[in-house]
Every structure is written in structure tokens, then in C-alpha cells.
């Protein structure tokens, strides 16, 4: 069987624009083409363009792009209802005495569309209205046909499995977050319980980098493509409905992923500021430099940036006597790679290299590309803010959404990679649940290690000692 090309490969194809938008209604005044490329259209016409008929099936890239971007204008449940309505009207599936041979011609295409929707955007179906519409449409087109009925069962079973997996993951994250406590609180109540540090758990930086990659890939895998869009969904002035994402059931996996980045940064800073002796702090810094370097080699840019961010936090960077004992040449190279100047030019070059390696990879290890997530979110945000979603004539600016989908589709490919490294539960548990310092506690630990250098720092030190330790 020929392999179905990945979405990102289809988006990158030189023939993409030529093949993608061969419309079933080329003359439709509601869809605007230029050089055979669909640039804009009314929302209604774009919905029509999504619905297959006997002679037409929309391209995968159009399906992905429209399902991703349409939620800026219309809630997925309403879109599903309208797609179902158009489908019923077009094929007259509501009429009594329906010709079964007519249904057999269109049923596979409708089922294929439903399959693509449920596989790519499964979280849409947490909404009970979506699930009802899915089952209702599927019931109408199966029309007693055993083969189609089995296909529908398979679609729904796969969907339920994905949604159950999401629920389990959300419960796990909640449990992990509940176990992760404030280190200062633990120091006061059970100081003996946190005598360990990361090096006593695992002294091999390469293994730690691999375990960080496990966490990254697991958390990436649960992020739905729509989460990049729903983050900046606002009420459309031409739409009377409520905000498309006011629902309580919307996934928050992207938020959880950003929180993981922040946790890792604070864990790094905590581990460096905790040791009493200068040589132990210097050793910890060098350890994390090696972890960060291995993350870079793996293609794990998110953990790399989190580690660098932790080491650049003021409570850590002010430890001048400690840094004087550190061989910083490797750290300087890593900082150069992640330098934010020129819009992160060096990082973007390294990311392109990793993405190219992934395309020609012979192993899962070579396929790993974990982008610096906050920058990806920022890029998508500015793409959304920099281009209007509606044109003056009321048309949807589809040219913008093609660019949006191109960025998100690349992420979709990267998040599907299976981690090739063996899991070490002990390291994973420590990294995810070890108590960490708050920002104030980090400053206090830093001042306790290397005293204040000026009056401002002295005043802050006194305030923190009083507030956190109850000492003058």
C-alpha cells in the first residue's frame, strides 16, 4: 500500500497550491482564487467546500487548515451541525425511500471526513453536541449497511479511547502537581525528607537529558493542534454567538506544557542554590551544562532553553564566586545557540537542521525535534495578530490560515515521535515532584550562600529572612 504523506510534507510540496484547491465549484463567487490558489471565501462557501459529494473529496491539507482555523469564527459543534446539514441536503439523505446505491456512493467519503476530523481534532468531541452529531450523521449514512456500521463503530471506539487517554493524562498531571510542594515549606516541616539532589538520584547528565526528553514527548503528544488557536480566540464581531472557547471542557495541555517549562527552570535554579558549599554549587552548574548540551544534541530545545533560563535567573547569575569556579566554555556555546537576538536566528537555524535530520531519519532518536514551545506560541500569536482574519468584504482570509496551518502541521509531525530511551522511574519522579523554591526563597538561598553586595540586596535579604524564616 502506498504511504499517506504526512501533513507537513503535503504543506511543503511544491505542487501544494496547484493540487489543493481544485474546487467542485470553480466559478463560485463566494470563493476567491488567484493563480489557482484559494485566497479567501465566505464562511458558508468554505463550509460547502469541506463537504464531499459523489464526485469530490476535499484535500487533506484543506480539511486540516479549515478545521483548525474555522474555530476563530464558529464553534466546532456548530460547524459539525452545518456540515451535517449540508451533507443531508446535498445527498437528500432525509428523504423517504432513499436509494441505497446513492448512499453507497457518498458514504465512504463522509466516513473518511469524519475519520479525519476525529483523528486530528479528537478533543472537539468532548462536547456532547459534537458526539451526538457524529453519531446521528453516521447512523443516517450507514442506513442498515453492515460494512459501514462496522466502520462507524471503529471510528467511535478509536475516538473514545483517545478521549479516555486524555482524561487519564489530565488526572495524572493533577496528581503530579499536587505532589510537587514548596521547598521552603518542606524545609521547615520535614528537612530530612529533602536531603537528596538531582546528582544523588542520577550522576549521569546524558541519562537525565534522556528522561527530560521522555517528559517532553509525553506532554507534547497530548497537545491538540486547536490549542494553538483557542489560546487567542476572541468573539468575532460578525458572529452573535458566545466566545468559541468559553467551554469548561476545552483541553489545557498547552498551558500544562508551559507550566512544565517553568517548573524545570525553577528546579534547575533550586538545585544550584541549595548546596552550602561553593564547590558543590559549581559542580551542580557544570552538571546542568552537560544535561543542556545533551538536550541540544538530542534535539530537545525546550528542555535546553528551560535549563538555560534557570541558570540565568538572578538568584543564580549573581553567585559570582560560584561561577568563577565553573568552566563556562560549553555554557557560552549553548547560550550563543539560544541567543534571542535577531529573532532567535541561531536557534531557528539549529531547529531547521534538526527538522531536516528528522525528515531523513532512520531511527526514532534522529526523528526527535522538540521546539522551544514559548517561541512557537509567540510566532503563532504574532501571525494571528499581524494579519486580519476577515477581509473588508467579510470574506475569511484563507491565505493567513494556510500559513497558520503550515506552522502547526510541523508541530503535529514532531509530537508523534515515540521516545526511544528507556524510562527511569526514579529520575522521572524526582524531576516531576521534587520540591522547588519560590522566587523569594531562591533569592534568600542565594544571599545565604553569597552575601548581599549592596544596600538594596541587604534590605531585601533582611526582609526575606523575616518573612520566610521568621528571623531578624
From Swiss-Prot:
PROSITE patterns noted in UniProt: RASGEF (PS00720), RASGEF_CAT (PS50009), RASGEF_NTER (PS50212)
UniProt keywords, alphabetically: Guanine-nucleotide releasing factor
BP-aspect Gene Ontology terms: small GTPase-mediated signal transduction
Coiled coil: none
CDD domains the UniProt entry points to: RasGEF, REM
InterPro entries per the UniProt record, alphabetical: Ras-like_GEF, Ras-like_Gua-exchang_fac_N, Ras_G-nucl-exch_fac_CS, Ras_GEF_dom_sf, RASGEF_cat_dom, RASGEF_cat_dom_sf
Matching SUPFAM superfamilies: Ras GEF
GO molecular function (one): guanyl-nucleotide exchange factor activity
Keyword NAD: no
Disulphide bridges: none
Domain Ras-GEF: 204-452
Protein origin, superkingdom: Eukaryota
UniProt xrefs under PANTHER family: GUANINE NUCLEOTIDE EXCHANGE FACTOR, RAS-GEF DOMAIN-CONTAINING FAMILY MEMBER 1B
Reported function: Guanine nucleotide exchange factor (GEF) with specificity for rap2a and other Ras family proteins (in vitro).
Protein name per Swiss-Prot or TrEMBL: Ras-GEF domain-containing family member 1B
Organism: Xenopus tropicalis
